[in-house]
Amino acid sequence: MCIRDSIMSYATSPTQRDVMLLGALTAIGASMERYVRCPYAGKLQSPCLQSFIVAPSASGKGILSFIRLLVEPIHDEIRQKVVEEVKAYKKEKAAYDTMGKERCKVEAPQMPKNKMFLISGNNTGTGILQNIMDANGTGLICETEADTISAAIGSEYGHWSDTLRKAFDHDRLSYNRRTDQEYREVKKS
């Protein structure tokens, strides 16, 4: 049985099959990162597929939750590495903090990036940017309720619809915060 048939076997109606196919293509495209490229507009581009499924209540959109299962192993592996890196960082930081005057001779340990593959749709504009940047421009927002996305985008600290448009075109993403003089960017999303 091919992967398409395996994915489609969860669907029980034509609507659910459409939702599963669109969701699977989007998730698989996101998981390809920069391993697959094609020429577009004079540049080599990797897949950046975006799906937003709109249909009446109880019409079968909920089956999209199964799509998340396709990419959870990727997310879980990344998160496990982050846990291990944070553990190592805390150990190094504790040793660094006890060095006393010797600290000036050694570079302070750096907190590891909070990498993830599955990015929460319930997020701020800067949060989305940080998640994408920490993952080197790759990630997937997979929410089963449109309200989660629309509420976050429309909130006071949301407004990340421009980030989605920039990511689609693989444009540079950046932000600057005066408070800590923090500037971050990813040259290609």
Residue ranges and their predicted role:
Residues 4-189:
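Phosphate-handling catalytic cores of nucleic-acid transaction enzymes
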